[in-house]
Amino acid sequence: MTNIRKSHPLIKIINHSFIDLPTPSNISSWWNFGSLLGICLILQILTGLFLAMHYTSDTTTAFSSVTHICRDVNYGWIIRYLHANGASMFFICLFIHVGRGLYYGSYTFLETWNIGIILLFTVMATAFMGYVLPWGQMSFWGATVITNLLSAIPYIGTTLVEWIWGGFSVDKATLTRFFAFHFILPFIITALVIVHLLFLHETGSNNPSGIPSDMDKIPFHPYYTIKDILGLLLLVLLLLTLVLFSPDLLGDPDNYTPANPLSTPPHIKPEWYFLFAYAILRSIPNKLGGVLALILSILILALIPTLHMSKQRSMMFRPLSQCVFWLLVADLLTLTWIGGQPVEHPYVIIGQLASILYFSLILIFMPLASTIENNLLKW
């Protein structure tokens, strides 16, 4: 009799995905973040479910329902802060996961990469809508500013914005539909994650050297399950430290003031994980131009496989490309810092220069470095 793990129609799918999966023997800790993202998604769905049991999506009671969760519900405060800071952990893992894909050339798995980009957009949309739900000042004005960007679309812009709002301003209808979308999107994300994994397991994982590793594969369990558990423990340690010692570290104090359409906060800014894109948006004086730059700042990832000029897949043995990559990381950190600063000198010019550098590094310097390295190989 064969093992049920290998014969049962359902269990064998799990077996081929997480147990007997042939995995390269040399993948480093940068490959941990895929499983960590899965854990983050499960955590967000579970904490979100329990929050939804007590939350009311009505403009008059939304803010007080969040206060009620934190004060009156058993362990409500920890569920709320796990959910809020869990989103930050999710994005940290996401950025590292995408950065790993960039560095080691994982984008040559086209289907996996493209589903990943769709996932990134979906997660960003979900996080944005989640930020609106507590109905504080930053929630309300963030929703107003970001949804208003769609009015830059020619002809249909204004109609589209009012259609999304469900009225002539961000109000009860907006909050209700945002809650509905925020609830359903994580399940769509889960479905996309399954497709993402399906495409990945068609080709097998990449590895740091970027060369095929079919002749040197090891089973995923126990080697990488143990390795992933270590990553998980470190993630949980970081998350719990944040939640239990400084839960509001990454939040905005303005969101502890109930939403007031008559009073605009001095600095409207999104959560930290959107600041780089917000800085790119603000660096262009034209509204439509800013919106296009904002979308392109993420969509440019879809061009990366086309821009790959190198004869080698990974950047492991390409020092010039490594320099460009780390410049890009530094530039993104600069943009994140600028996005949180007021619109005044010298922040405006720094933001504009960092935005130009961001697109230049990806579109010009990365292919250029690859071409130079190709020529150096001939010597």
Swiss-Prot record:
UniProt GO BP: mitochondrial electron transport, ubiquinol to cytochrome c
Cysteine pairs bridged by disulfides in the record: none
Keyword Ribonucleoprotein: no
CDD domains according to UniProt: cytochrome_b_C, Cytochrome_b_N
Bound cofactor: record note: Binds 2 heme b groups non-covalently.
Residues that hold heme b b566 according to the record: 97, 196
GO MF entry, a single one: ubiquinol-cytochrome-c reductase activity
Cross-referenced InterPro entries: Cyt_b/b6_C, Cyt_b/b6_C_sf, Cyt_b/b6_N, Cytb/b6-like_sf, Cytochrome_b, Cytochrome_b_C_euk/bac, Cytochrome_b_N_euk/bac, Di-haem_cyt_TM
Keywords: Electron transport, Heme, Iron, Membrane, Metal-binding, Mitochondrion, Mitochondrion inner membrane, Respiratory chain, Transmembrane, Transmembrane helix, Transport, Ubiquinone
Note: Heme 1 (or BL or b562) is low-potential and absorbs at about 562 nm, and heme 2 (or BH or b566) is high-potential and absorbs at about 566 nm.
Name of this chain's protein: Cytochrome b
Organism: Equus asinus (Donkey)
Gene expressing this chain: MT-CYB
